[in-house]
Amino acid sequence: NIKQRQKYPNHWSQVQQISLAILHKQYGREFKPMLDHENTNRSYLFGRLLAIFELMELKKYEIENPNKDKKESNRITNAERYWNAYTSQPAKLMMNLVNKIKPYEEAVKLNAHGIFHKLDKERAEIVQLLSPLMAKKDINDPLDYQFIFGYYAEKQFFYTKQEKNESEE
């Protein structure tokens, strides 16, 4: 069950990959691992946002311990800790996570400005896409299967080297 991440501390990557494949086949739609900046599905956007929160915190841990192997770290991020609750009540937990990652943001902003800028730009885009949905009654309803696709795509986007557009140069 992908909503219960804590049950798979050593095998999360495999569970995630299998879940993505099963959901892809079950829903018969084309899901690409590439980030879809046009997707305005509530679950997809909340998945992307959770990935941003997790990446910000992970970068802070990397700054603190640059020589420590990621796999050795037993540190649980707030995104991991609140995963189950977030998938059940995303809008409520989003505000909680925003407050919890503030100290991590400051450290990343000071020590890895480029990474901070990339994550902050992505977050601003997601929040802008979520803004029209925030007034709806169903904003805090449990997330559907598209959540995991948004989460995965955002993380893949972060770890993939991006070519600069002429407008960015």
Give the ranges of each region predicted by the language model.
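Intrinsic-disorder/low-complexity detector
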Residues: 1-169
